Amino acid sequence: MLGSGFKAERLRVNLRLVINRLKLLEKKKTELAQKARKEIADYLAAGKDERARIRVEHIIREDYLVEAMEILELYCDLLLARFGLIQSMKELDSGLAESVSTLIWAAPRLQSEVAELKIVADQLCAKYSKGYGKLCRTNQIGTVNDRLMHKLSVEAPPKILVERYLIEIAKNYNVPYEPDSVVMAEAPPGVETDLIDVGFTDDVKKGGPGRGGGGGFTAPVGGPEGTVPMPMPMPMPSANTPFSYPLPKGPSDFNGLPMGTYQAFPIIHPPQIPATPPSYESVDDINADKNISSAQIVGPGPKPEASAKLPSRPADNYDNFVLPELPSVPDTLPTASAGASTSASEDIDFDDLSRRFEELKKKT
């Protein structure tokens, strides 16, 4: 049922604060773990194996804690992504049961590291009742993440895990170390898988960052760190082999229909180019005469009526071409027609015009 002290906005703000605080702690603890590995290598070089084993247990604890923080960060991000379900539904959604119960279970164990985690747990208990919170803290409800419970447990790490940490640290820092033969012989067969899950992840073996903040080893595999394997050269096609599609193995039936085989394309060669170009009667010696305009060469031929009037010319020799005689241009004006005046001076009488003009002036 809906709790009276639940405040959705306060839960949203503290979820974001928890995510930011967890990221900072993961980065800090990872850097400290890397420095501690160098200290353990110095212990091994000095022959202080027991001191090195104790320091390795501290590193394993820190690596477990970093992985647990990553799980809690994931669950907080999930609650923010589905925050609408928390606000709208009075009952707990089945897809959020593991996230909510795990955060409530981890709050009293990590509140010294992340104080905002306790506020988140209190808001979730106010939302889904205090009785539900009690069941989550004791894991009587059975939905708390098992891996997180293993990472935050108070049990000592297995001896085989400690030995493998020492082996990897000695290998990375080039320090001679002889592992305990009794511990290596008594290692159960199932521990190897747990070791790979804890520290030796697939990402670390490939040279990439491990899932944990500092739990994995970055031992180079397949070459020194930073080198990239060269790809195999691609086979080049032969120049003398003609192209053809690969033939199928044989006819097969698809939905009861027989399928035939594909035939390769025949080798098609281009036709041979003749040694001398062919001659054309209509364009022979077209460039012999430079006086012929391009319009006469390229343009369409004359009409039959016009071509009949043109003088004949030799077909093969343009040098003997003679233009037809044209009439000369007249240099005198044509004669006046009958009944018309011969000159412009005879048509106009200026004396008569002046006399008439004077008479008009007198009348006015």
Curated annotation (Swiss-Prot):
Residues annotated with Phosphoserine modification: 4
Sequence intervals crossing the membrane: none
GO cellular component assignments: centrosome; cytoplasmic vesicle; midbody; nuclear envelope
Domain of life: Eukaryota
Gene3D superfamilies hit by this protein: Vacuolar protein sorting-associated protein Ist1 (1.20.1260.60)
Keyword annotations: Cell cycle, Cell division, Cytoplasm, Cytoplasmic vesicle, Cytoskeleton, Nucleus, Phosphoprotein
Residues that bear Phosphotyrosine: 43
Region (Disordered): 294-352
Cellular compartment(s): Cytoplasmic vesicle; Cytoplasm, Cytoskeleton, Microtubule organizing center, Centrosome; Midbody; Nucleus envelope
Record's compositionally biased regions (Low complexity): 335-345
GO BP terms, alphabetized: cell division; protein transport
Subunit structure: Interacts with CHMP1A, CHMP1B, VPS4A and VTA1. Interacts with SPAST, STAMBP, and USP8. May interact with VPS37B. May associate with the ESCRT-I complex. Interacts with MITD1, in competition with VSP4. Interacts with SPART (via MIT domain); leading to the recruitment of SPART to midbodies. Interacts with SPAST.
Biological function: ESCRT-III-like protein involved in cytokinesis, nuclear envelope reassembly and endosomal tubulation. Is required for efficient abscission during cytokinesis. Involved in recruiting VPS4A and/or VPS4B to the midbody of dividing cells. During late anaphase, involved in nuclear envelope reassembly and mitotic spindle disassembly together with the ESCRT-III complex: IST1 acts by mediating the recruitment of SPAST to the nuclear membrane, leading to microtubule severing. Recruited to the reforming nuclear envelope (NE) during anaphase by LEMD2.
Family (UniProt): Belongs to the IST1 family.
Protein name in the entry: IST1 homolog
Lineage start: Eukaryota, Metazoa, Chordata, Craniata, Vertebrata
